[in-house]
Structure formats: C-alpha cells, structure tokens
A protein has these predicted regions:
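N-terminal Sec/SRP start-transfer signal
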Residues: 1-33, 43, 48, 52, ...
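Short helix-loop junctions at transmembrane helix boundaries
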Residues: 328-375, 388
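Hydrophobic alpha-helical transmembrane segments of multi-pass inner-membrane transport and secretion
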Residues: 15-42, 262-297, 320-329, 378-385
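Hydrophobic secondary-structure segments that place a key small or acidic residue at a functional site
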Residues: 97-98, 113-118, 132-204
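Hydrophobic, regular-secondary-structure patches
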Residues: 33-114, 137-142
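C-terminal membrane-exit region of the final transmembrane helix in multipass inner-membrane proteins
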Residues: 367-407
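Transmembrane alpha-helical interface segments in multi-pass membrane proteins
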Residues: 288, 297-342, 382
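Mechanotransmission and gating elements of multispan inner-membrane complexes involved in transport
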Residues: 170-268
Length: 407
C-alpha cells in the first residue's frame, strides 16, 4: 500500500511532465484504436463491395467453367444441388444464372459483351443489380426485358424502350442464334467493366437463346455469416452426386482481395510498432527525468536499508499508473473518434478495387470488443516493459555518490 501511495504522489511531483507524457501515450493509443477500426472498416468495405456487387460470397459452377467460361460446361440438372442448398441453414439466399459471351447489337452499332440470364427475384438478394438501376425498371419476369449498362447504351446509341438483338452460340450445335429484346432498364455500377460489357435478361430467355432448357452455369450463394464463405466450401457439399461440381468461396474468386487483407494486417502491425517506439521514448524520458530529480531521495532510502527490489517495484508501480492513466484517456478519445466515423463515415471519393467501386464512397470504422480490452492492456504492458531499464538504473544508485551529488 505504501508503494502505491508513494508512486501516485511521485507521478504528480511534476504535473506538467506527467501530463505531456500521458498526452504522448494516449494520443498513440487513440490513433491505434482509430486506425484499427478504419482498417477493419476497409476490410468489410472491400469484401462487401466485391461480394455484393455481382460475384456473390460463393459460387457453384461446373468444374473448369471459371477457367475460360466455356458455355458447354453447364449444370444440366441442378435439382440435387438446389435440394442441398435449401436444407443449408447457413445460407440466406442463392441465385441461378446463365452466362455467355455474345454480340449485343442495336440499329446503329454492335459490341461484344457478356449476357447474363438471371432470376430477378433471387438475384436482388445476392447482388446490387436492382439498386444500380439509374433509368427505367428492374426485370419483372417478362421474356423480352433487358438491362444494359450506361456506357454500353451510349456506345450503341440506345435508350429505354429501344430494341437490342443478342447473338450467342447454341450449347449443343454451336450454331449462332439470335433473339430480340427491349431495354427496360439502364444500370450504372460505376465500374467500366460492368457498365460497358454486361447485359442482363431473364433466366428463361437466356436458356432459350442458348438452347439449354433447365440448365444453368452458375449458382451464386449468400451466407448469413460472410466468414463462412471465406474459403472453398467443397467439403461442405461433398455428398453431391455430381462430382464435376466446383464450389468456390469469395477468397478463391478474388485472390487479390486476400492479398490486400494481408497488407491491412501488416498496416496494423506497423502502427503498433510505431506506437511502441513513441511509448518507449516518452516513458524512458519521463522516468529518467523523475529519477534524476529524486537522486537524493533514492540515495537516502537506499542508505536506510531499502532493497533494490523495493526500488524497482516503486518505479514500476509509478510506470503502471502512468500507463493506466494514459490508456484511459487514449481509450476515451479513440472510441469517440471511432464511434463518430462509424456513424458518419470517412469520405473516400471514387475508389476502385478489382474493377469494383467501393460502396458509396464512405469508409465506416468498425468497433470491436478487443479494441476496448486488449489495445489498452497492450499500452500498459509496453509502458511497464519500457520502465524496466529506468527501474533497474534507480535500484543501482550508490547511496554515497547520490548524497554527494545532491550536495
């Protein structure tokens, strides 16, 4: 109890120095909490923007389809797979798709692109296509409806209600087939790849165009917990009868995002290292100045029989209080900033990752329990570790030299 009282009194013998040191350490902790929240928010933003734009959190395809998108590699009878998906309580939604490269033509121009056949009701649960409609209406289920990107619409010189001819190869005969559609909606994802190269029609119309009645190329999955779909899910559905099925999580679909996530973790480690340097410099400077101011005091208590261990304990308790006070202040400031930007967001402007625009241009920080518990403990522990050397220095003060120096 005596050590605690002495350490607390010694801490405020020079209030200005103590407050400056607290300001340094608490600022470092506040920055660490805010930066960690921003990094977590960036991770969520990147994953959400990629998976909710069009790709989905996971996909089921015929083995080899994703290598070159060969239209002949399709799932002829998805009934068994759909039965398994219906029973899976982890899923929140899924959507069936047909994909094919083809020609997209108007009365004025033509261009190559990707034709997507989708189920409108299912698709709105797994992608942002409905939310991306800038003109007109989303697909309602009528066979001749078509959605086109803004850039492609400008290239073909078409508008709402105009006719579009789609040309694609039949999956069985490889003969070219054509069908006529009308533009019901124009979408804008913000990514040139999507707005210039994709069109969407109803699933049944695409199946008819390609001659694959009942067949599909892709099933897009959405999970209640996105962590479920991080890696490949083959083991989860290994009892499927069709062994030619490939199930891929979002990390397999977008390896570049995985690499970016590793860099964000590295960023947190770098910030933690910088914080360690700041704390070390601040604590060592503060404690050494405090020790030199009390050189006579240490000489006296050593002369009356105080052990080295007791002096070490006194300095470490003082450092603990310094770390505790700094951690409390840094925690309050860091949480206030993180909470504010978790509501209002940090404006990013137009930022693109893997060809996909990140959300609505705002980064929202993410709060987590470990930021409240472990990061302040990390700061207190660093303060104690840094104080070990000054504590040992104080314990080795020779009483006679200390008294002579004081005189």
């Amino acid at each position: 109890m005596l050590y605690i009282e002495l350490a607390w009194r010694n801490l405020f013998r020079n209030t200005r120095r103590t407050l400056l040191t607290c300001l340094l350490i608490s600022t470092g902790l506040a920055v660490l909490i805010f930066a960690d929240g921003a990094i977590r928010g960036m991770e969520k933003l990147m994953i959400g923007s990629v998976t909710k734009t069009l790709q989905g959190e996971a996909q089921i395809n015929r083995l080899g389809f994703r290598d070159n998108f060969d239209v002949d590699l399709y799932i002829e009878n998805p009934t068994t797979i759909l039965g398994k998906l219906t029973e899976d309580e982890r899923l929140s939604a899924y959507s069936l798709r047909v994909l094919s490269g083809g020609m997209i033509g108007s009365a004025y121009n033509s261009a190559g692109g990707v034709i997507y056949g989708i189920n409108p009701e299912q698709e709105k649960e797994v992608s942002r296509i409905r939310d991306a409609i800038s003109e007109g209406n989303y697909l309602s289920g009528k066979s001749r409806e078509l959605l086109i990107g803004t850039t492609l619409a400008d290239l073909l010189e078409v508008k709402l209600g105009d006719r579009i001819v789609l040309t694609a190869a039949n999956v069985d005969t490889n003969e070219l087939t054509q069908d006529l559609f009308r533009i019901s909606g124009i979408f804008e994802f913000g990514a040139r790849e999507f707005d210039e190269g994709f069109v969407f029609v109803n699933l049944s119309a695409a199946q008819k165009l390609l001659g694959m009645e009942g067949g599909i190329h892709q099933i897009v999955l959405q999970f209640k917990d996105p962590k479920t779909s991080r890696d490949n899910l083959s083991l989860s559905y290994q009892d499927l009868e069709d062994k030619e099925i490939e199930i891929t999580g979002w990390l397999g679909l977008q390896p570049s995002i995985g690499a970016m996530l590793e860099y964000t973790n590295l960023g947190t480690a770098i910030i933690g290292g910088i914080l360690f340097i700041l704390i070390s410099l601040g604590v060592i400077n503060s404690l050494f100045m405090s020790i030199y101011e009390r050189i006579y005091e240490f000489g006296v208590i050593r002369a009356i029989g105080t052990s080295r261990f007791e002096i070490i304990s006194l300095v470490l308790v003082e450092a603990f209080f310094l770390g505790l006070l700094s951690a409390f202040l840094g925690l309050i400031v860091g949480l206030l900033f993180s909470y504010y930007y978790s509501i209002n967001g940090l404006p990013l402007g137009e930022m693109e990752v893997s060809g996909i625009m990140l959300g609505n241009g705002n980064l929202y920080t993410e709060l987590a329990p470990y930021q409240v518990i472990f990061l302040p403990l990390y700061v207190i522990l660093l303060t104690l570790i840094t104080a070990i050397y000054p504590a040992f220095f104080a314990s080795r003060i020779v009483p006679t030299r200390a008294l002579q120096r004081a005189l």
